[in-house]
Amino acid sequence: MKLRHFGRTGWKVSEIGYGMWGMGGWSGSDDAESSGSLECAVEMGCDFFDTAWAYGEGHSERLLGELVRAHPEKRLYVATKIPPKNGKWPARSEYRLDETFPPDHIRRYAESSLKNLGLERIDLLQFHVWDDSWAEDERWQRAVDDLKREGLVLAFGLSLNRWEPENGMRALHTGLIDAIQVIYNIFDQAPEDELFPLCRQLEVAVIARVPFDEGSLTGKLRLDSRWPEGDWRNHYFGPENLKASVARAEALHPLIPQGMTMAEMALRFILSNPDASTIIPGMRKLRHVETNLGASDHGPLDAELLERLRAHRWDREPAPWSD
């Protein structure tokens, strides 16, 4: 597993991390299976784990805390997120800071996450949603600065709305944001336009999330794909999105090199960009951990393939089905 610099923090983290959304105790998740997959990831050199209070109201955080405490000999980086007070995703400009991240709410959830994790500090605490209309509000800035000065949180970050990579750039200029989490993949290349250059300039780490576009870039999405009742993908891949996603993914099949899967190609597309500090594919099953983390061994894609993949950029606007 190769390591990358994580912005200005001084950390060097695994270039493929672990997204723990699927370990929130949802339907289909199994704690024993999840713990086994996490252990495998550590053995393979993964040291960056991204969770959130909202993933099962602390359930995923507790699993991560158990993992970290079981490996005192290793430096495992813990990233978690504060939910918005109003419980609404995504953030919208009409929501005031008092409705989303007032100072007392920031501290309360920082302390709640510390309790769930069973740790003395959080490496990276992130706002789970963000709108840049709040960027200049000094109240969240003071709350973040206080948590850092007290040593409860080492670094702070933002998780950006889907398909709004510029909606966070004003906050970066405060100097308080150390990392940005953004959707970036073969289809979603827009962060390269303005966000990534600013992150380079300010030495802000980039966490690339949704590397498989919720599943279309695994190569397994079909027009008749269905998921268990309650699975969010039934909403995301509804009539407005499924047909287009399948067509876009099928257009990539001729580009997949022999001996490579579409999922590996998707991960290595991101690895080919040095602006990405780490990628956090969601993983629950052992076989996915092994194949996804193994992509680090193969390195970037060749320049010709990268150029051809760039033609598959797909700029989209947020919609009710994408929330």
PLM feature spans:
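Surface-exposed, active-site-proximal loop segments in enzymatic domains
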Residues: 86-100
